[in-house]
Structures are given as C-alpha cells and as structure tokens.
C-alpha cells in the first residue's frame, strides 16, 4: 500500500444526522480490499464493504447518544462502554472517531463492524467525516485498544493510540481534506490577509522614523486574487471565494463539491486542495509560455507560473486570548495564537529563505509549517526557513506562544448586586503598559453582556472614552474614532450603576416553597449570595451564544487591535530574506494583533478556572 494519503470515502452530515453528501473512491477501495485479503488470507473472514449512507447516519446517531455529543467525552467516564471511543481514554478521540456499524455492543470487537480512523471536522451546521486508507494491521491494533480493561496509555507502552496515529501518514491528509470541504461548505474560502504599507518604496526607514515619534503609517490589506497565467500578468478574482455567503446562510452546493473532487482528488488521492488555484486553472487553463526548466520540478501547490511585477510580502497576524481574574488564588492566563501570512509575487520557481528571529523570547509552545516549507537548521533563537512559495496569499507558519510583552490590557472588573434588580460596577484598566513604538493600539472596547437581563437604566461616566448601551449590554469605547495609542500607556476607570427590569417570578404551587425560601434566607450569611441565589430561581435558560452567562452577570469582554509589531516578539528581518535565483524584488513586512476571547471575569462573582496539577 502507498505511504502517502488516499481517501476511501467521505460523508457530510447535517445537524439532523442525515447524510446530505457522500463520495466513495473505488480505486482506493480496491487497494483496501487487496490489503485486507493479504492480511487475512488464512482466516476465511468475509471482506468488509463500505457502509451505505443510511448505515453511516444510524451509526453516527448511535455514537452521539453513546458519547454524549458529536465529539464525545474524549476520556473514559462512568458512562463509557467497552469498545467506545471514550473507553480508549485519549482526548484525540474527539477528532479521530470510530463508528460501529451494528447495534449490538458485543460486535464492537469485530474489526469488520468498525469503521476507523475517521477524521471528524465540524463547520457551520455540518459534520464532515473523512475515512483515509490505512493498513488492516493498524485497524486490528485499534480494536485491541478499544477492548482493554486498563484506563489510559501506560508509560513506556508500545501500543498506544498516540503512537499508532503517529505512524499513519494519511491522518494529516484526511484532516486537510475535511477542512477544505468545511471551508467550501461555509463559504470561508477567502485567502489569508496580507497587509502592506501605502508607500512601499520608502520602506523600513520611514516606519522607524514615524514610529519613534508616535506616528503610525496607515496600512491597507492586499487583495487575494490568484495571479493569471497569461503573459500580461493580469490578476483574476475567484468569484467562489468572494461571493460565497457565510455559515448558515446558504444550502449545500453539491455541484461545487463534485467539481472540487473532480479536480482536487479525482481518484481519492489529494492533489491540490486550494480552491483558488482550482478556480484559476478552470478560468485560465495552463500557459505554455515560459515553461519551467526541465531540471526544476514544478510543485503541486504552484500549478502555473507568475508573470508580472515582483514583490514579497509578509504579515504576522496574532490573536491574544486572556482570562483575567484579579485574584490571588487564581493566576491570570494570557496566550497568543499567531500565523505568518505570505504573498510571493515572484516569477519562475525561486527558493526563498530567511532566519526567523525571536523564538526564545516568544516562548513558542507549538509550531507548524506549510507543506512548501523546509526547516533545515535551527538554533536557540533562530530558525532558518526555506520555501518555494505557491501563488496567492497563504499561511507559511502557525504557532502558539506566550505574550512576551505582557497583557496589552490589564485591570479588573467588579459588579456587586445591591438588590435583585440593581447593581454597582467598577472598571479599572491599564492599556499598553510597557509597550513602546512602533506598537500602536488603534481601538479598544470593553463590553458588559447581560443576555438574561434587560437594562432599563444606566448611570456612569468613564475617565476616558464614550459609552453606548443596548437592551442587553453596556459598551465602553476607550479608544476609537481615529484616536490611537502609541509610545505611551493609558489608565482609565469607569464606575457606574445599572438597573434591570424586574424578573418574572414563578408562581408558587403551595406554601412549602415560600417556607424553604425563608429557611434559605436564614442560612445565607452574605446578603449578596442570597440575592444571587434568589435571582437564579427565576432566570431563563442561558442562550447557546452566551454559554458562560449562567448568572445575571459574570464577565466583560475586551476587543482591541494593535499594529506595528507582534506582542510575542516574533519578527522577520527583511534584510535577511534571500531569494534564489537572485532578483531585485522588494520585501515588505507588517504585523497586526487582534483580541480573541479576552475576558475580564467579575472579581466579586463566579469564574471558571483550570486547576494546575
């Protein structure tokens, strides 16, 4: 069997657990049948066949019921049954699942009744299931893991799910296929954003001069059309990517999926999963002009050559997530998820190399690269990257890191209920403490959501910024309207009071409830605890959009954008970027930082936290 990635079948299931699209690949299935016969030639076992769509739907429904949700528990719990994914006791089973094709649990140890490994990816309202080609022996090893009595992988154990999956190269390809289909279904096929300054000819000198005096040059995003293969170098824009509605706003386009399969993986082996490349090839075909030299192999991610003005653009885009508690017993948590986006408008098939600086100061926790990249050497603080760039915008590298410069927004949020329908709150925040030019915060907003209470009155004046109230939220706009913060910090406070509409109390069936309420009032020493307890009886169920708001108040969410550099201290020195064969191509670099789930938990309320063991 080949060591690469081949897909036996894939299914797309909607939120009603119905298969709405499926595709089986007979060429790959023939390989599986041949390998199965070779492995079991002396056992006399019948050859297992791929299940029907109805069998997949029924098996997926049974798994959800048995595992508690679409993804499952991920670890062995009291509800786990022998042979189930959670029985294996590995969190990866939330993403690589198995399906039992029969209703009897006793058949779980028969490999013919189990479909594994299935890469599960959820996007929009759909679940994408991709079944890659694996060795029958690997399937038998997984069945053994499902039936063992001990819990979790033992230290030094040869047979564990992690070691098994590491030896299956098709797992990565299956997830790439699943993510590609998820992006097409949801319409999320827009290429990564690459930002370039308006005056690229001036370059880094202008940026350094303006940054030192607190002036940040404006930047604009580069559009992401795929370069045309015709000699004129005209660019095209993929209508599929730009006109596609977002998740939940359109039906499943089966014709688009069939056309994508016919081009990207016609016989089950992924060739090129870039929808923009495929759209460009269909629009332009392949150009016979300026073919690459015979000694150069044209990679799959660059189906034709670029022709036109040359330049190389890099953008570091980081997302900062934080949980700020302002409590001695719970430490604050800040993490950075970053990626390096690239756009290489270079003729021919050049190699690009550069040293990535800042690895030690960025405290990198995880890192991954685009298939076009090679990492031949690395050091304590430098890592050399060599890549042959594809067309259009692409993500060269993704990483998880610590926030080397510290939290961009520090502070606390307090809200105390003085009665059932009235509360007093206080914000105190410090923006960009320890941050220097060229880092510049373009806007900062703090929102207090109250999805289960309706605001009827509000009073409060912040020391900086403006306030906007809606029926279920209070928004404090600290920075905005063209005002940015660069080269200095800002401390701001916001005290105030807020009043909600009265809760609709439930009718008491008899006097027992009233007596129990009086008893609870006597047992509760803290008046505020009693108010919260009393309010929770009458609060409606929490909305799925706000799963953390289980009380009348819990947290405030911070939104911001920072430009000029990364907060993890990851950087690219444009002078160290080398292009071979050598060309006079300008190299530009930019960075922007946005907020993710940046939460200020109410210091006086309840807050979830993970215990450090």
Curated annotation (Swiss-Prot):
Family indicated by similarity: Belongs to the adaptor complexes medium subunit family.
A GO term from the CC aspect: clathrin adaptor complex
Keyword annotations: Cytoplasmic vesicle, Membrane, Protein transport, Transport
CDD domains: AP_MuD_MHD
GO biological process annotation, one example: vesicle-mediated transport
Annotated Gene3D superfamilies: Mu homology domain, subdomain B
Keyword match Transmembrane: no
Membrane topology: Peripheral membrane protein
Protein known as: AP-5 complex subunit mu
Organismal lineage: Eukaryota, Viridiplantae, Streptophyta, Embryophyta, Tracheophyta
Region of interest called Disordered, as start-end residue ranges on this chain: 501-522
GN (gene name): AP5M
Subunit structure: Probably part of the adaptor protein complex 5 (AP-5).
Domain MHD: 309-563
Compartments it resides in: Cytoplasmic vesicle membrane
Biased composition (Acidic residues): 511-521
Lineage: superkingdom: Eukaryota
